[in-house]
Amino acid sequence: MQNYDVVVVGGGHAGCEAAAAAARVGAKTLLVTHKVESIGEMSCNPAIGGIAKGVVVREVDALDGLMGKVIDKSSIHSIILNRSKGPAVWGPRAQADREVYKPTMRDMVLHYENLTVISEEVVDFTVDGVEERPQISSVLLSNGELIKTTRLVFATGTFLGGTIHVGNESFPAGRIGDKPSTKLPQALTAHGFQLGRLKTGTPPRIDRDSINWSKLLEQKGDVLPTPFSFMSECVSLPQISCYVTHTNEKTHEIIRRNLHLAGSRCESLLDVMAPRYCPSIEEKIRRFPDHKSHQIFLEPEGLETNSVYPNGISTSCPIEVQLEMLRSINGLEQAVMLRHGYTVEYNFIDPRELYHTLETKKIKGLFCAGQINGTTGYEEAAGQGIVAGANAALSLVQNQEPLVLKRSDSYIGVMIDDLVTLGTSEPYRLFTSRAEYRLTLRSDNADMRLTEIGRAYSLVSQERFDRLSQKKQEMHALLNALKGIVATPNDIAEYDIAIAQNGEKKNAFELLSHPNINMEVLLKIWPSLRSFSAGTLALMEIEGKYAPYLKRQEADIKSFLEEENLSIPKDILYSDVYGLSKEAQEKLQAVKPFSIGAARRIPGITPAAIANILIHLRCKHKSSHKSL
């Protein structure tokens, strides 16, 4: 019998990051996937990043993950979304050449130290112990082989009990052309997990040569693409344009006429939730009947392929209806469909079954990441994968603290806290609005926030850590230089600096907080600052712009962390807490919050309930982090 420290099931975005993270920490890791050639497949949109999502990719990269490096090698259309707004909501996004992204990710994974990859299917797992929380002991493969392990990560994507729907046709599949995992859901149910169903969809693909590009609006990317990885100097491939078109009344009439035939509208799927913010075109027509048109982005899927992805018209209508719909759209009158769209439904667990480490509460050593936890999106999956994989490996080390990212230090922390505290009834995706501390959680400073944390957990290479140290030294030197330049009221008048004067002296860093002052203005007045790199100057400008607000946010974060550090013992009996209502007891017992802060975020838990818990813990002297 083979023996591995960590076994990861699934070779998608969550699984790749989980396996690589476990291997980086030092665990002997096995990645089991149905087909090795499908590792890193972009099942839907061939793009990485976006609003909030782009920050997650940079956070994954700051922890030495794979996604940022891979997209930099495969990007063909890069853009910073929300560029006209503040840096706190900038969203780096890159269209990928899918035939470059997938093999690049696959090659990285196949050549990763401490990591073995096999093409197989995990059909069951065993546990040791009959106590309340048994321990993972092995996994069973479809060929009958038993592999011994005490740490298991499920990153099953849409394959867990996956079923595809196109029109009136339904068939088992995790992705078009790939069989689902049908036995694992049974195994999870047998061990007491309650599984729900979610669905998502994808649009048809169009032949590039059948599109009348002259009728469409061109959308160019950034002239100087910004790499995702802090280790990349530039992107590798030539950049191309995307194009914009719209649906129209004729399109909508075709869809309305055939709405009853859409697979996503079949009776068995009506109560299965789809992504709220990425609805199918038939759902858009149903929900927004007054809209005359809906925007479609035509995104080439690569430099050497004819396949074009029409972003915005995910559909599960019958194939002939899909073609009719496409040909009603401006520029697509002669469209040739290379592949039809479809809806896929799949199993997920209630993420409230997880700790913040992404380990399940029911079974010790079992971790989950990605769509199995109710999320949608490559980036959300990658963020969970790196946390689950790292913690699976870290938990093997005696007395080792787990990697728990907080709401105050990362979007990954926001996402995990939302999931394990609130749960979800629909596919969860990240937005900047979900983060209370988004002025701090920016795409430009992900390495400053997380790389040192990653290094402390053996996730980050010496090379990356050294690069961060050099960057911090440069930032510190520039900050000192700016603070050392003092502008008197006379200087402000002499240099024609357009700010309100109150008679006080201001240093150059303080000047940056004024809306009319940017780094370019300071460089004209004090040319000596040009000795610093353009990248360092740009980052410092952002810090200067937000400085007054960041100071206030630091106070908010301090208050937040005080409650996060007030731990609640895992063995607490909420029925023993005096004055706690039955409803509060049930909610707290279901979530099992790790801290007072986490308990406060549970819907329905009142300030009075929190006070009762604090009194109970003080009396019992059971706080593990600090005196309560």
From Swiss-Prot:
Residues engaged in binding NAD(+): 274-288
Gene Ontology CC entries for this record: cytosol
Classification via PROSITE patterns: GIDA_1, GIDA_2
SUPFAM superfamilies documented for this protein: FAD/NAD(P)-binding domain
Disulfide bonds: none
Compartments (UniProt record): Cytoplasm
Cofactors: FAD
Domain of life: Bacteria
Molecular function terms, GO-annotated: flavin adenine dinucleotide binding
GO biological process, one term: tRNA wobble uridine modification
Keywords annotated in UniProt: Cytoplasm, FAD, Flavoprotein, NAD, tRNA processing
Residues annotated as binding FAD: 10-15, 122, 181, 371
NCBIfam families: mnmG_gidA (TIGR00136)
Described purpose of this protein according to its UniProt entry: NAD-binding protein involved in the addition of a carboxymethylaminomethyl (cmnm) group at the wobble position (U34) of certain tRNAs, forming tRNA-cmnm(5)s(2)U34.
Record text on subunit structure and interactions: Homodimer. Heterotetramer of two MnmE and two MnmG subunits.
Family in the record: Belongs to the MnmG family.
The protein, known as: tRNA uridine 5-carboxymethylaminomethyl modification enzyme MnmG
Organism: Anaplasma phagocytophilum (strain HZ)
Gene that encodes the chain: mnmG
